[in-house]
């Protein structure tokens, strides 16, 4: 199985969300790269743009010895698909989790209004964010993984504006590498998962029972098993 895996985190969290997967993949001998996106984690305070987000993934993949398997969660999944659609270099595969709905402008603008209101709270929404995380992810260890690298409170407006430039069906249709779409059965953002699957050239849809939007943390063991199986399938298909 050894090779490289790039793990791209979601909105407002950071590379810390991947602790469980990093430990599992490292134990199997993989090189694991977990970049922080602009405005998140160690890059808190930077402005987020779609171009800089894509460049972050490109730099992470370039730094890793091949074959490289790319994984993205939510925001990271949208960015990974967008990047892979334009990427001339071969990758082993891509797993896009919890990004099963096209980010239409109307939806994004509604979220921007809501995010703006929350940002007016005295703590800019930190308490609300952490309360929601701990309510959705009952295991305190995994809930802490979400927030351990810092909570990106100031990046919402930039991200929701920039996501207008992502066209998931178009992106998925242009990716030659195998694609896995992984969603929790309780995820509210999987409305178009079948359309997205139909758009892929070589795609697999996996639903993890009982998992919410934060699938890799709500069901970490099950998610990691799916991820390892996906990586192994690409390794076995690669000519010696």
Locate predicted features.
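Flexible "cap/lid" loop of the alpha/beta hydrolase fold
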Residues: 85-86, 91-122
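Catalytic active-site module of serine/aspartate enzymes centered on a nucleophile-bearing elbow/loop
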Residues: 203-240
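Conserved loop-alpha-helix segment in the C-terminal half of the alpha/beta-hydrolase fold
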Residues: 179-212, 217
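Active-site loop/oxyanion-hole signature of alpha/beta-hydrolase fold enzymes
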Residues: 31-69, 225
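The conserved beta1-alpha1 loop
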Residues: 8-10, 73, 183-184
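Conserved alpha/beta-hydrolase catalytic His-Asp/Glu region
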Residues: 106, 123-174
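Conserved HGGG/HGGXW glycine-rich cap/lid loop of the alpha/beta-hydrolase fold
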Residues: 1-42
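Gly/Ala-rich beta-loop-alpha elbow adjacent to hydrolase catalytic centers
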Residues: 72-76, 80
């Amino acid at each position: 199985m050894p090779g490289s895996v790039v793990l791209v985190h979601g909105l407002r969290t950071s590379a810390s969300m991947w602790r469980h997967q990093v430990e599992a993949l490292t134990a199997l001998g993989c090189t694991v790269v977990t970049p922080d996106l602009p405005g998140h984690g160690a890059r808190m305070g930077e402005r987020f743009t779609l171009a800089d987000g894509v460049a972050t993934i490109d730099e992470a993949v370039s730094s890793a010895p091949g074959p490289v398997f790319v994984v993205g969660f939510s925001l990271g999944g949208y960015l990974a698909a967008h990047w892979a659609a334009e990427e001339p270099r071969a990758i082993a595969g891509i797993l896009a989790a919890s990004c099963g709905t096209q980010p239409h402008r109307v939806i994004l603008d509604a979220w921007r209004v809501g995010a703006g209101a929350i940002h007016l709270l005295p703590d800019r929404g930190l308490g609300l964010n952490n309360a929601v995380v701990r309510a959705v992810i009952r295991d305190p260890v995994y809930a802490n993984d979400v927030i351990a690298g810092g909570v990106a409170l100031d990046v919402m407006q930039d991200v929701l504006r920039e996501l207008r430039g992502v066209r998931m069906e178009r992106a998925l249709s242009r990716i030659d590498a195998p694609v896995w779409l992984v969603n929790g059965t309780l995820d509210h953002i999987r409305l178009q998962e079948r359309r997205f699957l139909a758009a892929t050239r070589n795609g697999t849809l996996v639903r993890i029972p009982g998992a919410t939007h934060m699938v890799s943390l709500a069901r970490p063991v099950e998610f990691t098993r799916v991820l390892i199986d996906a990586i192994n399938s690409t390794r076995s298909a690669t000519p010696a």
